[in-house]
């Protein structure tokens, strides 16, 4: 039954995306940019409804008060395709730095360009990267939320952190707050899998790390606060969802955390 529900959800998920893009594209490009953003945000909301109704997966967001009204860097853990879109409805005007090749995709690329997403050639250096930074500064000055995944790629729940220093350079150069975000959607929507699992989890938006720190100090603090919250949520999520099949990385990390608790008495 779970395989059937997963198949049904996956089918409707992509059908929902394709139909909305085709049907709503004319309206999307007529509307002003910020108003048009409600179309992808409503797509995200509809996906939450599909996942709740078909699979039985729900979530809650804590710490929305930690999102500033000024420009900021939003720095979530990255475990699943889910976290690439799920928080769009909770952010006023998010912007991504994307591989430039994504902008070449019909419909998707057009949508992204309308929302002033920032394209980057990952092989580029020098002047090209300076242009990316200038674009990022423009969007920060407009009060937008720059979404950056500090580890760069999807990591399974409980995996050893592999943060990339690029976010420290952005923190130094953009001089805006960084908002760490901990969550474990990868337990319910695993990477490289078509299975979807029912249950409930939390997304925890942590207090801002304000600008002005030395980049090395910032980088260590980002890792420390994010991983501490991530460990807490891992234990809580597994305790509240005992039916979940856990990846080896989560099993190992839970054993390590429980061992520390035992040693601490």
PLM segments and residue spans:
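Glycine-rich helix-loop-beta junction characteristic of Rossmann-like nucleotide cofactor-binding loops
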Residues: 63-67
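Catalytic core of membrane glycerolipid acyltransferases/transacylases, capturing the structured
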Residues: 21-41, 45, 52-54, 69-125
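N-terminal hydrophobic signal-anchor/signal peptide
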Residues: 1-8, 258, 265
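Non-catalytic C-terminal accessory region of glycerolipid acyltransferases
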Residues: 130-265
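Generic preference for hydrophobic
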Residues: 61, 74, 96-97, 203-205
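Short acidic-hydrophobic, aromatic-tinged amphipathic segments that line or gate anion-handling sites
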Residues: 61, 118-121, 211
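A hydrophobic membrane-anchoring feature enriched in long, contiguous, low-charge segments
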Residues: 4-29
């Amino acid at each position: 039954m779970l395989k059937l529900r997963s198949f049904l959800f996956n089918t409707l998920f992509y059908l929902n995306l394709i139909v909305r893009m085709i049907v709503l594209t004319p309206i999307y490009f007529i509307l002003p940019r910020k108003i048009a953003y409600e179309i992808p945000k409503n797509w995200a909301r509809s996906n939450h409804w599909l996942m709740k109704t078909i699979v039985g997966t729900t979530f809650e967001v804590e710490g929305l008060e930690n999102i500033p009204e000024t420009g900021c860097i939003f720095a979530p853990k990255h475990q699943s395709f889910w976290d690439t879109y799920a928080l769009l409805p909770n952010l006023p005007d998010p912007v991504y730095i994307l591989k430039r090749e994504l902008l070449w995709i019909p419909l998707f690329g057009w949508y992204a360009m309308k929302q002033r997403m920032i394209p980057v050639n990952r092989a580029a250096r020098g002047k090209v990267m300076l242009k990316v930074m200038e674009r990022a500064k423009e969007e920060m000055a407009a009060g937008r939320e720059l979404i950056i995944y500090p580890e760069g790629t999807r990591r399974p729940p409980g995996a050893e952190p592999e943060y990339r220093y690029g976010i420290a350079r952005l923190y130094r150069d953009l001089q805006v707050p960084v908002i760490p975000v901990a969550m474990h959607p990868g337990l319910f929507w695993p990477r490289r899998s078509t299975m979807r699992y029912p249950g409930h989890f939390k997304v925890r938006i942590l207090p801002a790390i304000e600008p002005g720190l030395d980049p090395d100090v910032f980088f260590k603090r980002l890792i420390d606060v994010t991983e501490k919250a991530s460990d807490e949520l891992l234990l809580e999520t597994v305790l509240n969802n005992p039916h979940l099949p856990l990846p080896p990385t989560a099993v190992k990390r839970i054993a390590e955390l429980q061992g520390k608790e035992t040693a601490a008495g």
